[in-house]
Amino acid sequence: LSRADAGTFLRYEHGGEQVIGVMAKDSTNNYYCIESGERVEYQLGESVKLRDDDTARRLGWLMDHYRDGTAAEHAAIAVLAHDLLDLKPDTWKSRRVSVMRDNPTLRRKVEQMWEEAGSNAPANATVTRTYAEGTRTGRVTVSVTNAQGKTIAGIKYAATLNGPAVFANGSATVTGISGAEPIVYSWKATGEGEVKASVAYDRKQVDVF
């Protein structure tokens, strides 16, 4: 790992000058601290996937969406990471006061970005299957929703038929990007037997080192 670039963090005073934002980087990723008061080590240990819940999906979405963001945006992500994951919450609590004192507009930025992530981070994908008995054909409808149950666009997915059937492309799998409305695919049976459908979608995850 290498040091964070200028313009990816904000400064504040807390027993000396400190920074809040990106703490380290590699060729593709930014890294944020979740252990207040500890010195940054520019080495990666073993990684663990953060639990797959709404918090992880929102943070993952923010880290990906604002990969090339402003100093304030990176600082807001860092604040959220500390708020939700810090291993020393009492230490972070006092530091947070200093962060907000020296960066008074950051509080609203944190709130806005968390709300934005809630609207855009995928929480669920649904697929429904219909079948016309006489023609041995059917349709699969795919949609991706956020934590509020609203359909969201721009999420990569793959829908798969489980059974003797293919989509119009001749394959049992179709891939696409979700839209603001559900997307419908036609399929036809290729033999006898039940046909079911499943869907997998792209959701960003957070690695903890």
Residue ranges, per PLM feature:
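Short S/T/G/P-enriched beta-strand
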Residues: 108-137
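Short beta-strand element of the conserved SAM-dependent methyltransferase core
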Residues: 142-144, 161, 183-189
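Beta-strand-rich structural segments
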Residues: 134-150, 195
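Low-complexity "stalk/linker" and mucin-like segments enriched in Ser/Thr/Pro/Ala/Gly
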Residues: 152, 156-180
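Short, hydrophobic beta-strand segments
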Residues: 175-193
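Short, surface-exposed polybasic-aromatic patches that bind anionic ligands, especially phosphate groups
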Residues: 1-118
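Enriched for extracellular/lumenal, surface-exposed ectodomains of secreted and cell-surface proteins
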Residues: 191, 197-209
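Beta-strand elements of well-folded, non-transmembrane domains
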Residues: 146, 161-165, 201-205
